[in-house]
């Protein structure tokens, strides 16, 4: 059995300059440790911990695919329920609650942002206190209650304003009606915020990660997960939205409630069969310790050859990948400087982990800090996607939505399906055609690097916004210069331009997501330490949440600033009197600036373990590794 050590070319040059250092990022200078006192430890040894852990693992019964009908069934109905409730919420707020379009868009963006922020809180609570099963149990019930409350706002006349019809001035909702609606949205925040970071991991928990069949099962489960997600979105944005828009809001909202109830029943039916992983404590404490220790030691001078002279005890049951030393954020290195006052336990661990941290802990924090600039650029990018999920709906409402000569009208909210369709189709093309072609050119297994994939998504987002501006200019010109098709409720005249012209901008946005969104998920997953994978998933949603809040702020600011401008309100209720194309062009400029910033950060970024092109795997015998650990222990 062999273990792997990852070194890059620069590491090997360093190694040649230090002949006595066999493994320059794990060996500890014995001279630095002599003044230290060692406290006797009454705790169990690493060997005892490992044996106890392995014994506990052997007792776990992994049922794998036998419990997948419960998990995937719950996933399918839960997604159908949530998306069925939320997909047409923008139209619901404007047509049933008589809210202005910009007010409804602001509420939707704030609501989406809160859900995405909730994933971070849920990931923390899940890993630290409750575990995934208990978190999901609360979340699915909360989703059912939220969907039920939203249904009541449509079914009970006293819970929504009087129907407006074609009136120009409509009665708005009362405070009580708004509060009842917000209560339903609050339940959905708790539910969706808990489900998103935990569902994937809970499904993967049901497979044995050490067996070949278990590993294959995990990969297949991920495929089924994303299939059900896309399936639920398409069904909700077509069939459910059509019923809500053309049959009845009450019937259209009963369907998601019934589906959420089925999701709860199916989930709890498998209660006795699930593998329920206990909460193991939050890795956020480790981050806090490194920062606290570095601040306490801020007056110390940096050590020479930090990869040798910094404290770097590695327990035998250490789960994370061993990282090489990096010379970025050197202030954090001070957390691993050993002073004469600090003590070690007999097993080599620091007696006070808030004053002394290992080099590995420091490098893990560096990984997270290094990701933040990329995450910031990705957050700005999501402004484009957030806008493409809202304003094309308003454009469709004032465009010709007729399909064929039969008089069938495509519901306005359904046009967002073209974004997801573009994303789904391009993913297949990317995986089957583009990656093999790029692989022959670049020599990379993935065709292009993760940051290159994200950057390609940013480029398509810019193209999407630019096309959106030209399409909106065309739509408004048709409405102002050619015969219209009547009046849209509470907005203005319907342009004779076909709403199918919105497909190019939405398709480009879908391609942007195929590059950037999936690239970000993979990037965070691979660049975060192994014990922070749940947070790696949540940071993606947190970025989308920040973007939703930024979109709300941007919409409100533009609406307020341009309300009395000579050119007119850019985001007026009647798009024919607005300048939505100016808004799109402004966003295009913002995305270009963000792209330039991203390129600078991508050039500065260092991948965890080294660049893909610069990695050499050096295999060392396990016996040699044990001897090295024994030498480290003796030096203590």
UniProtKB/Swiss-Prot annotation:
Chain segments annotated as transmembrane: 77-97, 105-125, 136-156, 175-195, 221-241, 249-269, 367-387, 410-430, 451-471, 499-519, 535-555, 582-602
Cellular compartment(s): Cell membrane
Alphabetic keyword roster: Cell membrane, Membrane, Phosphoprotein, Transmembrane, Transmembrane helix, Transport
Gene Ontology molecular functions: glucosinolate:proton symporter activity
Induction: Up-regulated by wounding.
Major localization listed first in the record, in broad terms: membrane
GO annotation (BP), single: glucosinolate transport
Family of the protein in this entry: Belongs to the major facilitator superfamily. Proton-dependent oligopeptide transporter (POT/PTR) (TC 2.A.17) family.
Source organism, top-level taxon: Eukaryota
Annotated CDD domains: MFS_NPF1_2 (cd17416)
Gene3D superfamilies, alphabetized: MFS general substrate transporter like domains (1.20.1250.20)
Tissue expression summary: Expressed in stems, flowers, siliques, roots, shoots and leaves. Expressed in veins and in adjacent mesophyll cells in leaves, and in the root vasculature with highest expression in lateral branching points.
Pfam family, one: PTR2
The UniProt record lists the keyword Membrane: yes
Chain residue ranges for the region called Disordered: 1-45
Cited InterPro entries: MFS_trans_sf (IPR036259), POT_fam (IPR000109)
Regions of compositional bias (Basic and acidic residues) in chain numbering: 8-17
Source species: Arabidopsis thaliana (Mouse-ear cress)
Name the record gives this protein: Protein NRT1/ PTR FAMILY 2.10
């Amino acid at each position: 059995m062999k273990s792997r050590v990852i070194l890059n070319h620069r590491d090997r040059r360093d190694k040649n300059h230090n002949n006595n250092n066999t493994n320059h990022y794990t060996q500890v200078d014995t001279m630095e440790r002599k003044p230290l006192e060692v406290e006797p430890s009454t705790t169990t040894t690493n060997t005892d911990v490992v044996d106890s852990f392995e014994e506990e693992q052997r007792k776990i019964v992994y049922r794998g695919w036998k419990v997948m009908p419960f998990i995937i069934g719950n996933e399918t109905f839960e997604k159908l329920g949530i998306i069925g409730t939320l997909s047409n919420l923008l139209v619901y707020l404007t047509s049933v609650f008589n809210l202005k379009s910009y007010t409804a868009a602001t509420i939707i963006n704030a609501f989406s942002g809160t859900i995405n922020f909730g994933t971070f809180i849920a990931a923390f609570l899940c890993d630290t206190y409750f575990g995934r099963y208990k978190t999901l149990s609360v979340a699915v019930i909360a989703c059912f209650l939220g969907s039920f409350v939203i249904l009541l706002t449509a079914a009970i006349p006293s819970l929504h304003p009087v129907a407006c019809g074609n009136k120009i001035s409509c009665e708005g909702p009362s405070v009580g009606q708004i509060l009842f609606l917000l209560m339903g949205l609050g339940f959905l925040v708790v539910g969706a915020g808990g489900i998103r970071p935990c569902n994937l991991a809970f499904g993967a928990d049901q497979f044995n990660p050490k067996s070949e069949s278990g590993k294959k099962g995990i990969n297949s489960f991920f495929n089924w997960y994303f299939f059900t997600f896309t399936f639920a979105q398409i069904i909700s944005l077509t069939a459910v939205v059509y019923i809500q828009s053309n049959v009845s809001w009450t019937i259209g909202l009963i369907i998601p409630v019934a589906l959420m109830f089925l999701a709860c029943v199916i989930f709890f039916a498998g209660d006795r069969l699930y593998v329920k992983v206990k909460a193991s404590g939050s890795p956020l404490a480790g981050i806090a310790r490194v920062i606290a220790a570095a601040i306490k030691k801020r007056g110390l001078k940096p050590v020479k050859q930090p990869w040798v002279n910094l404290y770097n005890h590695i327990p035998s049951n250490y789960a994370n990948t061993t990282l090489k030393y990096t010379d970025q954020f050197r202030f954090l290195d001070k957390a691993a400087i050993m002073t004469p006052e600090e003590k070690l336990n007999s097993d080599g661990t620091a007696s006070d982990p808030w004053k002394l941290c290992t080099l590995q802990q420091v490098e893990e924090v560096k990984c997270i800090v290094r990701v933040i600039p990329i995450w910031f650029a990705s957050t700005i990018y999501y402004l484009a996607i957030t806008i493409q999920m809202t304003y094309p709906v308003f454009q469709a409402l004032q465009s010709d939505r007729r399909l064929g000569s039969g008089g069938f009208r495509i519901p306005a909210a359904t046009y967002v399906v073209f974004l997801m369709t573009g994303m789904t189709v391009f993913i297949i093309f990317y995986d089957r055609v583009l990656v093999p072609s790029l692989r022959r050119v670049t020599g990379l297994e993935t065709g292009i690097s993760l940051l290159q994939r994200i950057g390609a998504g940013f480029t398509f987002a810019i193209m999407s916004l630019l096309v959106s501006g030209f399409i909106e200019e065309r739509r408004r010109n048709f409405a102002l210069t050619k015969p219209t098709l009547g009046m849209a409720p509470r907005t203005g005249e319907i342009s004779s331009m076909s709403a199918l012209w919105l497909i190019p901008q939405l398709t480009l946005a879908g391609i942007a997501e195929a590059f950037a969104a999936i690239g970000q998920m993979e990037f965070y997953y691979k660049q975060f330490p192994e014990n922070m994978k749940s947070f790696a998933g949540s940071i993606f949603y947190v970025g989308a949440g920040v973007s939703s809040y930024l979109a709300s702020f941007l919409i409100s600011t533009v609406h307020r600033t341009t309300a009395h401008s000579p050119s007119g309100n850019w985001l007026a209720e009647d798009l024919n009197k607005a300048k939505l194309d100016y808004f799109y062009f402004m966003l295009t400029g913002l995305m270009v600036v963000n792209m330039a910033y991203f390129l600078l950060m991508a050039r500065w970024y260092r991948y965890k373990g080294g660049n893909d092109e610069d990695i050499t795997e050096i295999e060392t015998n396990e016996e040699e590794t044990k001897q090295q650990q024994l030498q480290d222990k003796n030096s203590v």
